[in-house]
């Protein structure tokens, strides 16, 4: 039986893969509803491991799957989250005897590993974590600057967010709406680093 929002998320992840795979799921109470209506945001992966909106077959299969376990008074709307693609810019100061090109390469690899798995739906993106990752790279003396930017159109999602309006007051994280998910889609081109 599914009682809590976490129960529903757990059930969605446990749906048999032959009915479709869900990469990320977030269940939230529908604040516009007087009844016990829940909004379930789901996203899938394509064959390249990139986030993609779940197709109608997966959504229908999920609805049938959840109906076996839901409380009689619960209604569930299965919705698409906004996929927000982003990139990272950074400037580091290498240690004196370090090869600056090798240091930049190590920094890019460390960030690729950090963002290998997409964040969860509604999860904040911590810019402070980017600083921390870069600071721990061998050969980095100091992290001069690190920021994120939105990538949209073409091979990227068409969704966007105003970064300045959604940054925390201290600039340490980007608040992400509950119906959105951040993805570093093409790390080989979306991470740009310089040395100073």
Regions of interest found by a model, annotated:
Residues 1, 102-196:
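An aromatic-glycine-centered, glycine-rich loop/turn in mixed alpha/beta architecture
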Residues 1-124, 184, 191-196:
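Carbohydrate-recognition loop of C-type lectin domains
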């Amino acid at each position: 039986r599914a009682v809590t929002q976490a129960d529903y998320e757990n059930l969605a992840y446990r749906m048999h893969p032959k009915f479709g795979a869900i990469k990320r799921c977030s269940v939230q109470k529908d604040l516009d509803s007087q009844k016990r209506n829940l909004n379930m945001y789901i996203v899938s992966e394509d064959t390249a491991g990139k986030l993609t909106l779940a197709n109608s077959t997966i959504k229908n299969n999920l609805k049938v799957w959840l109906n076996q376990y839901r409380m009689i008074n619960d209604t569930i709307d299965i919705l698409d989250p906004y996929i927000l693609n982003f990139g990272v810019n950074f400037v580091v100061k290498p240690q004196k005897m370090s090869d600056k090109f090798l240091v930049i390469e190590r920094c890019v690899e460390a960030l690729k590993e950090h963002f290998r798995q997409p964040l969860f739906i509604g999860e904040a993106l911590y810019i402070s974590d980017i600083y921390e990752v870069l600071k721990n790279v061998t050969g980095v003396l100091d992290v001069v600057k690190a920021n994120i930017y939105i990538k949209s159109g073409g091979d990227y999602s068409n969704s966007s967010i105003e970064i300045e309006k959604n940054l925390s007051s201290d600039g340490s994280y980007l608040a992400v709406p509950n119906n959105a998910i951040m993805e570093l889609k093409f790390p080989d081109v979306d991470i740009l680093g310089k040395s100073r």
